[in-house]
From Swiss-Prot:
TM annotation in the entry: 5-25, 36-56, 77-97, 103-123, 126-146, 158-178, 197-217, 229-249, 264-284, 292-309, 319-339, 363-383, 396-416, 441-461
Catalysed reactions, semicolon-separated: a quinone + NADH + 5 H(+)(in) = a quinol + NAD(+) + 4 H(+)(out)
Source organism of this protein record: Heliobacterium modesticaldum (strain ATCC 51547 / Ice1)
Entry-linked InterPro entries: NADH-Q_OxRdtase_suN/2, ND/Mrp_TM
Known function: NDH-1 shuttles electrons from NADH, via FMN and iron-sulfur (Fe-S) centers, to quinones in the respiratory chain. The immediate electron acceptor for the enzyme in this species is believed to be a menaquinone. Couples the redox reaction to proton translocation (for every two electrons transferred, four hydrogen ions are translocated across the cytoplasmic membrane), and thus conserves the redox energy in a proton gradient.
Subcellular location: Cell membrane
Listed GO MF terms: NADH dehydrogenase (ubiquinone) activity; NADH:ubiquinone reductase (non-electrogenic) activity; quinone binding
GO biological process terms, semicolon-separated: ATP synthesis coupled electron transport
UniProt EC number: 7.1.1.-
Entries under NCBIfam families matching the protein: NDH_I_N (TIGR01770)
Protein name stated in the entry: NADH-quinone oxidoreductase subunit N
Cellular component annotations (GO), alphabetically ordered: plasma membrane
Keywords: Cell membrane, Membrane, NAD, Quinone, Translocase, Transmembrane, Transmembrane helix, Transport
Membrane-topology descriptor: Multi-pass membrane protein
């Protein structure tokens, strides 16, 4: 047993426990800011550690745990998302009545759950990591004490999340019953086609469909995203979705008979197509920025599912690259939503009118983030979609790429609608919106990375290629 393969997870666990201890020992009014900075520097240190884990590609604990380049890349996505959400949440947490320091500890523990999911090579390990992530989100979604919308969102997420976890666990238990093992690679060697396997695969797809907000398992996301604290919404929409795909890719490429008995690629293709269409079309009439971004995140899941359809290294490379840029752009958009919502007390798109006059930086970051999500060149989103769609086109399947292109053009409408409010209309209030140092750092980082990855994607694409090849 090689405990060194768990270095990043052990450090993350120690960081979360340390943050809780600091919060208990120091109850001063502004102590949460010090805790936030400690969390950021701790996560940055862990991120640096991951750079030295490339090339290991081995497992331990009787194959229950795997550390390969794929899992390392995914962990870096989660860590980047966690750092950005903590920086963007510092001012927001100022307005919370109680339990300020615990907020950051919960974000760290949610990140730990995602990291466990990425390295899980066993169904039980996978489920433990997923539940660690999910339970912390149950708390974070309902974190605004005395707020009816937040409490309602928390209850909805608890009930629906618990139901989806039960469905997923049923599917995993069927796999164990069919094969006698919970080690994912062994499933491929032992699985034979049967009706029970069909039920198992359907329930697993349903369970993870909830986690990634794929249609028709997406209905929870708009209400939960709207009611949850805005920084939590961003983290849930970006990092949690990436964690779901981290597992889906490993399960379906290593442990599922995608071409045996029935064509499960067809199921994935249908999910991808419907998810892209429903997510983009329903986003058009939304008047609340968080609900609009919720349906946008549904559509983004459809694009990522197109990459899964290719079942090869280029497709996985596209998923990894797009997941990273999606996290960065999405966190930038939600950081702006956090700052604006805190300043004006509203999340309505109409209230973004004249934002370019009140705070040009926030308007610029929101515009670039939304255009990147739409796939407009020369931003990173264009390159990411190019990788995803070209991977499936190389397989000779053209319709997902064509549908994805059409739906990307549809998304331009509702993304530009927000931009028009910000740049064309006059503000209802002339007072400038304050932007603190941590928030400014978050949005500038998001904007710069989104632009640079669009112009010069080579280095990240090369790392994503290496990570993808570790699965094959």
């Amino acid at each position: 047993m090689n405990f060194s393969l768990l270095t990043t997870e052990m450090l993350t666990a120690l960081l979360g426990i340390g943050l809780l201890a600091i919060g208990l020992l120091n109850r001063k009014k502004d102590s949460h800011r010090g805790v936030a900075y400690a969390a950021v520097f701790g996560l940055l240190g862990i991120l640096v550690v991951t750079f030295f884990q490339y090339g290991i590609n081995t497992n331990t604990f009787h194959q229950l745990w795997i550390l390969d380049d794929y899992s390392v890349f995914m962990k870096e996505i989660f860590l980047v998302a966690a750092i950005l959400v903590i920086l963007s949440a510092i001012d927001y947490v100022d307005g919370l009545p109680r339990f300020k320091t615990e907020f950051y500890a919960l974000l760290v523990f949610a990140t730990l759950g995602m990291m466990v999911m990425a390295s899980a090579n066993d169904l039980v390990t996978l489920y433990v990591g997923m539940e660690l992530m999910t339970i912390t989100f149950f708390i974070l979604v309902a974190y605004i004490l005395g707020d009816g919308r937040s409490s309602e969102a928390g209850v909805k997420y608890l009930l629906l999340g618990g139901a989806s976890s039960a469905v997923l666990l049923y599917g995993l238990s069927l796999l164990y019953g069919l094969t006698g093992t919970t080690v994912i690679p062994d499933l491929l060697a032992r699985l034979t086609w049967s009706p029970a396997l069909a039920i198992a695969v359907v329930t697993i797809i349903a369970g993870f469909g909830f986690k990634i907000s794929a249609v028709p398992f997406h209905m929870w996301s708009p209400d939960i995203y709207e009611g949850a604290p805005t920084p939590v919404t961003g983290f849930l929409a970006a990092a949690s979705k990436a964690a779901g795909f981290a597992v889906l890719v490993r399960l379906f490429l290593e442990g599922m008979p995608l071409q045996g008995g029935a064509d499960w690629l067809t199921v994935i293709a249908v999910l991808a197509g419907v998810t892209m269409v429903i997510g983009n079309v329903v986003a058009i009439p939304q008047t609340n920025i968080k609900r609009m971004l919720a349906y946008s995140s549904v559509a983004q899941a459809g694009y990522l599912l197109v990459g899964l359809m290719s079942t090869d290294a280029p497709g996985v490379k596209g998923i990894l690259f797009y997941a990273m840029l999606y996290v960065v752009a999405n966190m930038g958009a939600f950081a702006v939503a956090t700052a604006v919502g805190r300043a004006i007390g509203s999340d309505e798109i109409a209230d973004y009118a004249g934002l370019s006059q009140r705070q040009p930086l926030l308007a610029s970051v929101m515009t670039i983030s939304l255009l990147s999500l739409a796939g407009i060149p020369p931003l990173a989103g264009f390159v990411g979609k190019l990788y995803l769609f070209s991977a499936i086109m190389d397989k000779g399947v053209l319709w997902p790429a064509f549908l994805g292109f059409v739906m990307s053009m549809v998304s331009v409408y509702y993304y530009l609608n927000v931009s028009l409010y910000m740049w064309r209309d006059d503000p209802k209030d002339d007072r400038p919106i304050p932007v603190s140092g941590p928030m400014k750092l978050t949005v500038i980082f998001s904007m710069v990375v989104t632009v640079i990855l669009g112009i010069y994607p080579g280095p990240l694409a090369e790392v994503a290629t290496v990570a993808a090849k570790s699965l094959f």
